Swiss-Prot record:
Family: Belongs to the folate receptor family.
Glycosylated residues, chain numbering: 121, 161, 201
Claim: Glycoprotein is one of the keywords in the record: yes
Record GO terms (molecular function): folic acid binding; signaling receptor activity
Signal peptide: 1-22
Taxonomic lineage of the native organism: Eukaryota, Metazoa, Chordata, Craniata, Vertebrata
Protein name: Folate receptor gamma
Summary of the function given for this chain in its UniProt record: Binds to folate and reduced folic acid derivatives and mediates delivery of 5-methyltetrahydrofolate to the interior of cells. Isoform Short does not bind folate.
Residues that coordinate or bind folate: 103, 107, 124-128, 157-162, 196
Keyword annotations: Disulfide bond, Folate-binding, Glycoprotein, Receptor, Secreted, Signal
Gene that encodes it: FOLR3
Record-level GO BP terms: cell adhesion; folic acid transport; fusion of sperm to egg plasma membrane involved in single fertilization; sperm-egg recognition
Source organism of the structure: Homo sapiens
Length: 245
């Protein structure tokens, strides 16, 4: 009787172990937090050198999740990548637009966002970033350089009119200054893409926040940041569940 009971326990343990290991391909292992690419529309499956990365994306050329062609498209006013038009409320100021290009380069090219990658139920991507700790100076400069440009929405992630094939302001949405829609730097950096970023209290060079801008000749400072947060997660942080947006 005891032998039969022990055999039953072993069988149940084997079944539970098998079920736990049979995860879908899109699932990201808890330890898979460093040097990884998102499972998204234009990302490579693995980071690798890209010597021909264009313009503002060039800091990632030593190790990138984006291709050279993707980096070129990111610099266009309306690229074929997402058919997204920065100039939906008139011409965006160049000093403002450079921040959006840099934001796009970070999103598409960085292999150091693993600790903040989450699974999503979306047709065009299986993963997104959530609450990436953006260095406070990068956010403040972004807001300062864009406060006099114009937009019609405080969340650019959803709610656009796509009937023409590119994003247009939804009915009733008025074009006004960024400062009207984003009264603070945090309102811009955190609200713009549904909390992809969270403004950090840490400064650039601290090793505790992600830098949108960096000099690649001095190395990529975001590698150290990713390692710090990955170690914290592996030490016992919350689970990485599936979210809807």
């Amino acid at each position: 009787m005891d032998m039969a009971w022990q055999m039953m326990q072993l069988l149940l343990l084997a079944l539970v172990t098998a079920a736990g290991s049979a995860q879908p391909r899109s699932a990201r292992a808890r330890t898979d937090l460093l040097n990884v690419c998102m499972n998204a529309k234009h990302h490579k499956t693995q980071p690798s050198p890209e010597d021909e990365l264009y313009g503002q994306c060039s800091p990632w050329k030593k190790n990138a999740c984006c291709t050279a062609s993707t980096s070129q498209e990111l610099h266009k006013d309306t690229s074929r990548l997402y058919n997204f038009n920065w100039d939906h409320c008139g011409k965006m100021e160049p000093t403002c637009k450079r921040h959006f290009i840099q934001d796009s380069c970070l999103y598409e090219c960085s292999p150091n966002l693993g600790p903040w990658i989450r699974q999503v139920n979306q047709s065009w991507r299986k993963e997104r970033i959530l609450n990436v700790p953006l260095c406070k100076e990068d956010c403040e400069r972004w807001w300062e350089d864009c406060r006099t440009s114009y937009t019609c929405k405080s969340n650019w992630h959803k709610g656009w009119n796509w009937t023409s094939g590119i994003n247009e302001c939804p009915a009733g949405a008025l074009c006004s200054t960024f400062e009207s829609y984003f009264p603070t730097p945090a309102a811009l950096c955190e609200g713009l893409w549904s909390h992809s970023f969270k403004v950090s209290n840490y400064s650039r060079g601290s090793g505790r926040c992600i830098q949108m801008w960096f000099d690649s000749a001095q190395g990529n400072p975001n590698e150290e940041v990713a390692k710090f947060y990955a170690a914290a997660m592996n030490a016992g942080a919350p689970s990485r569940g599936i979210i809807d947006s």
